[in-house]
Each structure stands twice: as C-alpha cells, then as structure tokens.
C-alpha cells in the first residue's frame, strides 16, 4: 500500500510517498481503508517541525473511510461500516487527562495512508447525511467549533457570534451559528474571503485592514454588548 511519511520533521520537502505492507491487526483493532482526509494547521505544524514528532511519522489527523476487517475482540463495528477519526483516540470517556490526550498524526501515526490498523474506540460513526469527503472535515475543526459554541457556549437563537478569519474552525463556527439562529459577524483582511463568508451566511462583514479598530465596529453592531 501507499503511505506518506515525514522522513524528518522540518519541511514539506521531507514528506515522502512510500510503499509498505498492509498493517496487521491486534484483537481490539479494525483495519480502516482511508477514503478521504482533510488538512488543518496542525498537520502543517507537524511537517514543519513546530510540533515535535518522530522521524518517519505518518501525518494527518482527520479522515474518514470504510472498515474492511475487524479484530476478534471488536464489538463496536463490522466490515463495511463507514466511520471517521477522532482527534484524541485514547480519550474514550470521563474527564480529560494529559496522558490520554495523545494527538493522532504527531504522537502516533496518522491517516496519510491507504490502510490503518487502529483501536475500535478511536473511530466514530459518520452522520447519515454526510458522505466520506464531508465527514473527513469534521474531527478537529468541526468538533472544536461545536464544543465552543454549543457544548460550552450554550448558543441560543438571536445571540451574536464573532468569527475571526477564514480558518477551518471559524468557517465551521459560522455555519453552526447560523444553524442555531445566531447573528454572525465575520472578520478578514481579504475582501474576496469576506465575500465567501457572506455566501456561507455571515450577517456582517468587517475588513480589519481597512477597519483596524474592528472591535469598535463589533460593539456598534451588537449595541455595545460584544
């Protein structure tokens, strides 16, 4: 099978496509055929050496695919199930603990590979309304936005949400906020990107290059509530 390895952290030129054997399974693992992956800034930081990792690390934290084989102790999945990755595969339940927050793609091999053997608890079901490509974008950026707005923020219709920039978390936050009936204020330094945010539903747009005191603009739009 084909696989991408980071021969040594410190530059994109160190990413190499190699041929290697399909992985063997432990009893609690599944063999996942990776169908789609998405890139986020974490992956770039790993490749550039800004997040430490071992030589020959397989990068990428976000993916979706189909289970093609299961270990003899696996009970959660069966062959043919379509699933997606989770950012912290060792954090299964309970309060987060440092030793459980191993991030796939830097502390352990990630999804830049055709097949990966991974514990059954490291995957979750794809929502029925999403295809594999769409689901592959969710694990890190989508979940981060959800936790901030819904889980922690208890977002309600009619509230205002400020999204800064056009990174993955901001774009997901914009769409989630609109789904919940919130008013979204979006910032960027690019008029072209602001138009894309408008197309996604942003109610108010602020170019922080032409409006360097953009915070005051936000206060105006929210009756000084922020």
How should these model regions be labeled?
Residues 22-37, 47-92, 107, 127-129:
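Glycine-rich beta-strand-centered segment in the early N-terminal region that forms part
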Residues 163, 178-226:
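Adenosine-nucleotide cofactor-binding segment
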Residues 2, 82, 182-184:
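Residues at the starts of beta-strands that form the adenosine-phosphate
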Residues 87-164:
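NAD(P)H dinucleotide-binding glycine-rich loop of Rossmann-like/cofactor-binding domains
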Residues 10-17, 41-43:
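Short N-terminal binding/cap micro-motifs at the start of the first secondary-structure element
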Residues 170-171:
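N-terminal Rossmann-fold NAD(P) dinucleotide-binding loop
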